[in-house]
Amino acid sequence: MIGDPGQIPPTVTIAVDRWEVSPVAPHMPAPEVAMENPDLRAVTQLLELDTCRRLPGDAVELVNYFYDFEFSAFAAKGERFLRPTKKTSDSRIDSAILTLNDHSTVIYTHPTGADGAPIETDTELAQVAADFVSRLLALQCEVSTSAAETNAPRILTAADIGIVSTHNQMNSAIGSCLPSALMGEHGIRVTTPERWQGLERAVMIAVHPLSGVQTPSAFDLETGRLCVMASRHQSACIFITRDHVGDTLNSHLPAADQALGRGDTIGRGHAQHTAFWQYHEKRNLIV
């Protein structure tokens, strides 16, 4: 088996309470079952890859938060980048794009209205995602995704851009905001983290899983989705969200309602989401 500890667990739509402490739980990822079962662990050889070839160096530092072992970046410092070739404006979107000159990730916050974030699909945020696509292409950003492109970067195209959100309705809303000419097999891909597993693009735009969420659920705090969303890019990743997420994480007390003998996945998810947010906060990477 090839298993990624950061992968998304299978989606199960039936009650699984009776299997929660089973040594061969059918609803858990097979690699995790093998590692936690003493009999299977004894006959399993574990090989850990110590180098990530997809991500830039600072993104590897960020994604390491999701793993129980450390790994390094294959890419040399300064090898990967995204930078505009046209004059930028003083807009917040352009400011976020300029931040990617020296960093590979940035969080763009959209104001939450007096009535709170929309309960249904956040069409305003969907338009923000489309606006980022428009600006990236209008600024004719040049991108380097490997050592071969560092000294000869190429101009970013729609096929270099991917968009990810945890909900299908949001992805549909984003798709409706994008020109049809930019979509399709050889254009921008917009889908869920589950369908992004194993794939990559030069630039990713991700809707933060907690955007619009006031009381995070186990689904919202599941770290596999955030890990996938933060690790699909070769050069740059832009997270977009309503501006309440930091406060939501600070005020939320996760409920430890797991079965006896099982790990506290909700508490761990809250801690990793908080570490992810604070990583950007401490480096002034929240616009």
Where are these regions (language model features)?
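Conserved helicase motor core of SF1/SF2 NTP-dependent helicases
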Residues: 1-287
